A protein has these predicted regions:
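Short glycine-enriched loop/turn motifs at secondary-structure junctions
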Residues: 25-27, 65-68, 106-107
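Short, well-structured N-terminal submotif of metal-dependent ribonuclease cores
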Residues: 1-38, 49-61
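Preference for short coil/turn "hinge" residues that link or interrupt alpha-helices
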Residues: 6-7, 15, 30, 66-68, ...
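Hydrophobic side chains within alpha-helical segments
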Residues: 8, 44, 99-102
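Active-site-proximal, substrate-binding regions of enzyme catalytic domains
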Residues: 40-86
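Active-site neighborhoods of divalent-metal-dependent phosphate/nucleic-acid chemistry enzymes
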Residues: 70-112
Length: 112
């Protein structure tokens, strides 16, 4: 299983450095997971970065279509407590800590 955060997920919809790698890895393993936050964060970013291009509507729709193939990991109170510890211990941003805490809730050892 591959766990993707918002920055990896966005590389499927916006061509940028790392997009080819993300596409290849996600083709090689069809079991994907992400925190429920990843969809909201990705859709808002697509709208913000692609507004005025006319592409944001299509890309948000594609993300919604593909979201059905992603195991959505809930962000609950336990996840947020875990995120707080990760964020404080490793001095990382809040959203990154939440994504990492959600990844820890997946059974087994997902790839990142």
């Amino acid at each position: 299983m591959i766990f993707v955060d918002s920055s990896a997920l966005l590389k499927r919809y916006i061509q940028e450095p790392g997009s080819d790698l993300v596409d290849r890895v996600m083709r090689e393993d069809s079991h994907w997971a992400a925190s429920v936050l990843a969809r909201t964060e990705s859709e808002i970013t697509l709208c913000r970065r692609l507004s005025g291009t006319g592409l944001h509507v299509d890309r948000v729709r594609r993300l919604g279509d593909e979201w059905h193939y992603i195991t959505a990991v809930p962000v609950d109170a336990d996840c947020l407590l875990r995120a707080r510890a990760i964020g404080c211990d490793f001095s990382i941003r809040t959203l990154d800590a939440i994504h990492l805490a959600a990844a820890q809730l997946i059974p087994g050892r997902p790839a990142f």
